[in-house]
Amino acid sequence: MEEKKKKVVVAFSGGLDTSFTVMYLAKEKGYEVYAACANTGGFSAEQLKTNEENAYKLGAVKYVTLDVTQEYYEKSLKYMVFGNVLRNGTYPISVSSERIFQALAIARYANEIGADAIAHGSTGAGNDQIRFDMTFLVLAPNVEIITLTRDMALSRQEEIDYLNKHGFSADFTKLKYSYNVGLWGTSICGGEILDSAQGLPESAYLKHVQKEGSEQLRLTFEKGELKAVNDEKFDDPIKAIQKVEEIGAAYGIGRDMHVGDTIIGIKGRVGFEAAAPMLIIGAHRFLEKYTLSKWQQYWKDQVANWYGMFLHESQYLEPVMRDIEAMLQESQRNVNGTAILELRPLSFSTVGVESQDDLVKTKFGEYGEMQKGWTAEDAKGFIKVTSTPLRVYYANHKDEEV
């Protein structure tokens, strides 16, 4: 009786490493290979079709696209907007957040089909190996994790030669730059990125400046969620994000260089272009300045910073993340209205807001103008009381110079 083949789910992106993994496990190890592409919004329909065709050519017995774009928005992107999350005040955590949901989808699929193993193409140098492995260890604890790229330490050329030898050819030419294109931005690695003193040339970006002059962009939020772009309403938040990306990318908005610490402790540098995240977060933060109290903004910033860090550090499944999400969700109850931005090549600025929850418009008075909610004597009394701790301190430390 023929021995039953073991099932392996390969997290398949269509790139060199995962292509090699599919073929090697099918041919050399005798696995029944299930190629699964977890899409968080970064793949086009054409790319997914090519992935399917190639997976079967490489030896997979089955190919599936696991579309988790809506889940990615509902369980991650939404909260990153609520928290105005930018890692180190710069990077919208594009790749980090996507990887977690890709791993979740792969783990669920592996459990569903009763897989014996899960394979992915991460190297031993980056963050992704941690994000994938940790998720699989938690959600598919009895499934073996296979990482040929990490364990066999093969060069790109060795992988290409192996594929060619077995009749599979594709354009795996190593370009100067490598890109990770996603719904929440595109990361750029390689080339000048490897030199701390250099920036990226225009040619390195996938989206180029197409517009001159300036225009206004109106982004409307309801309870913190983007609902309209230039007064065009969207029921699907993904389509709203894509619309903002289309408008902002034409001006080359959202380009920057992120320098941060990897999970394993080394510093890394990555270029990125992320028009939609930077515009949406910029508009949302601006609207919050009008609609939230001082302490709501302060404490939300603290927990949002932790949320972004935990997301990056592969701690999405940590229970405290659900607690932080609950706080962020509740903080948005009055974040309603339209933020107006001015777009121009490579930059944008804030203009104003229209909101029924605007706390700047108040019967108590306007900053720097005539007060209406208190008298001059009230103001003087408030100032005197507020100064009490300082007056007490310096009365007891008259020798201190200031």
Annotate each language-model stretch with its function.
Residues 2-11, 16-402:
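Nucleotide-activated chemistry modules centered on ATP-dependent adenylation/adenylyltransferase
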